[in-house]
Amino acid sequence: MEHDKITPYKSDAEKKEQVAEMFDNISGKYDFLNHFFSAGIDNLWRKKAIKELAKDNPKIILDVATGTGDFAFEAMKLNPEKIIGVDISAGMLEVGRKKIEKRSLNDKMEFLLGDSEELDFDDEKFDAITVSFGVRNFQDLKKGLSELNRVLRTGGKLIILEFSKPKRFPVKQAYFTYFKYIMPVIGKVVSRDKSAYNYLPQSVMAFPEGKEFQEILKEVGFSQSKAIPLTGGIASIYVAQK
């Protein structure tokens, strides 16, 4: 099934509306489940991804699909002047804003409710854009990536951290077993949303990755890109330049 057709719930609502509802439902347990399912390795992935911006010294960063803000907070280590996070889920943003308050970062960070496919920003506003486990949830992938290209300044970088599909034994077999059979059961019990953690593996399986995804980045206007596989191909960092 095509990536755009994978949705969390069996309803007539648009994919983006279903995604917002899903993340609202699981927002209170999202951070715990994220770190639990990955055994904390997702934190290492974020650190490595943000290091790709270390030499660029970006002053204004946009974190798209910011969720509860973990990627944005990691990007704060670059000491930018401002980070703006955008997400379609009010529930996730509520959790993220509490983190901003707790860290006393109100003067440097702002989280806004918004649609990544219709960003309310001027052209070429941001020095860098980051997305962690978010592009897979875009309703229209090319439209969303085109919007990221539009608001990124010429020469700026896009950093995407996303799940991918390992190819080699035994990581491949262990990954698919865990992802398809174990994670959905635990996720359902803890989050109390029976669909959210079934949607996760389905969306990963349908998502274009590697060179196929890089071709899409090129198609929407990014001049060059590279893919960095992580932990045996469980996830990938994509670095693209406008």
Please report, for each region that a protein language model flagged, where it lies by residue.
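Core SAM-dependent methyltransferase catalytic element
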Residues: Q214, V220-K242
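C-terminal alpha-helical "lid/dimerization" subdomain adjacent to the S-adenosyl-L-methionine
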Residues: E17-Q18, I88, L161-I216, V220, ...
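A short acidic, Gly/Pro-enriched loop at the edge of an enzyme's catalytic core
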Residues: E117-A128
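Class I SAM-dependent methyltransferase SAM/SAH-binding core
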Residues: I60-E118
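Hydrophobic beta-strand segment of the Class I
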Residues: Y30, I129-T130
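Conserved alpha-helix/loop element of class I SAM-dependent methyltransferases that forms part
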Residues: K29-F32, A39-K59, E74
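N-terminal auxiliary segments of SAM/dcSAM-dependent transferases
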Residues: M1-A20
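A short glycine-rich, Lys/Arg-flanked "PGG" loop and its adjoining helix->strand segment in the class I
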Residues: K142-T154
